[in-house]
Amino acid sequence: MIRKTLGKLYVQVLIGVAAGIVQGVAAPNLGSDLKPLGDVFIKLIKMVFAPIIFATVTLGIARMENMKELGRVGVRALVYFEVLSTFALALGLIVVNLVQPGQGMNVDAAHLDTKAIASYTHAAARPQTFVDFLLSLVPSSIIDALARNDILQILVFATLFGIALSRMGTRARPVVDFLDVFTQGVFSIVGMIMRLAPIAAFGAMAFTVGKYGLGSIAALGKLMATMYLTCVLFVAIVLGGVARLAGFSLWKFLRYIRDEIFTVLGTSSSESVVPQLMRKLESAGVSKPVVGLVVPSGLTFNPDGQCIYYTMAAIFVAQATNTPLTLTDQLVVLGVLLLTSKGSAGVTGSGFITLAATLASLGKIPVAGMVLLLGIDRFMSEARAITNTIGNAVGTLAIARWVGAVDRERLQAALDGVPEAAQTPPQAVHVHAPVAHVEAAHPPLAH
């Protein structure tokens, strides 16, 4: 029994997290030197990140029977992302005003040392326009996009390539078959990499506690507690509501992806589980085209945890520096963040750059106040990353349910904990089929 429990990945990751905390407290200098353990794991995941997105998206689109549905899935996904991002920003705004974690700190922004955030404010001084964003979607070279792991550029090329293969018909069969085998091989590599997750969690947590210390948590514990509380509320209320509307149990789904959740807890990176999450969703009966389109784009357009953090951090700085903000001012903050929060996920330091750009554009909240966040930002990254991951997974499944791209029997079996080997063979779920038809007829799943 004990051996079986210890053999589960999420248990091993939890042990790694606990051991990392103990290491960071007992020997902080050694703990802060263990960062490479987590970095290597993240780099290994990023190594297969671009190939998986390219192959999965291309393969999924190439096998779609109705190209019109590709646009329908994309439009629904973008609308969903915008609505959920707004909910996340609004919830962060409401909770930070109710709890007021920065009230009473009475910080004079003029006396803060801003050297530590100079690189972020310098980057924020060159804001990206909407035209710049559109231009950045088109890769000058697909090799360059793959080398830089540029998610959006890879998605654009893979979508076009998939459409081209679909239009070629049987002539594209050799390429499609190759991509199928290639995808299976890369996912096999992912399985090997995931065995290192407990070691990565140990190193990442030992570094965090060893470098920043538990004292930084105590100093700004109210803000941290508020952040974690808000993320829990968002998952339980907002994502719970989405799951109910889509017709599946949120709690069963969270249990189904628990390995990925605990891996994110240890590594503080939502990117670290994207390949495994895509495989899990496909195993649960979600069609490959929907998984390939929604999961990668959700990283950029649907960072729910990041959105909660943005409004919370902005208002916290205002409270701590005694900067008065009217309701209109706060709604302006929300509106600006609704635009600036897009396209920043997955880039190191992007959260601080986005926040700095937002505060600078508003002109009311002192950018120097961001110094207050440096000490605990790393401790809040777990909450952001976990919420991002859960939000992306729930969103993908919900969108798939709404466009009729889920094999209901396989989904129910997965949520009930039936081993994949014991399930019935995959069946073809056509994206264009209405949900009622899929549930009633269960047409065969395209491979």
Swiss-Prot record:
Paired cysteines (S-S): none
Stored Pfam families: SDF
Family (UniProt): Belongs to the dicarboxylate/amino acid:cation symporter (DAACS) (TC 2.A.23) family.
UniProt-listed GO biological process terms: L-aspartate transmembrane transport
Bilayer-spanning residue ranges: 5-27, 42-64, 77-99, 146-165, 186-208, 223-245, 315-337, 352-374
Secreted as UniProt keyword: no
Membrane topology type: Multi-pass membrane protein
Native source organism of the sequence: Ralstonia nicotianae (strain ATCC BAA-1114 / GMI1000)
Species lineage: Bacteria, Pseudomonadati, Pseudomonadota, Betaproteobacteria, Burkholderiales
Keywords: Cell inner membrane, Cell membrane, Membrane, Plasmid, Symport, Transmembrane, Transmembrane helix, Transport
HAMAP family: C4_dicarb_transport (MF_01300)
SUPFAM superfamilies: Proton glutamate symport protein
UniProt name for this protein: C4-dicarboxylate transport protein 3
Function according to Swiss-Prot or TrEMBL: Responsible for the transport of dicarboxylates such as succinate, fumarate, and malate from the periplasm across the membrane.
InterPro entries, per the entry: C4_dicarb_transport (IPR023954), Na-dicarboxylate_symporter (IPR001991), Na-dicarboxylate_symporter_CS (IPR018107), Na:dicarbo_symporter_sf (IPR036458)
Compartments, record wording: Cell inner membrane
GO cellular component annotations of the record: plasma membrane
Gene Ontology terms, MF aspect: fumarate transmembrane transporter activity; malate:proton symporter activity; succinate transmembrane transporter activity
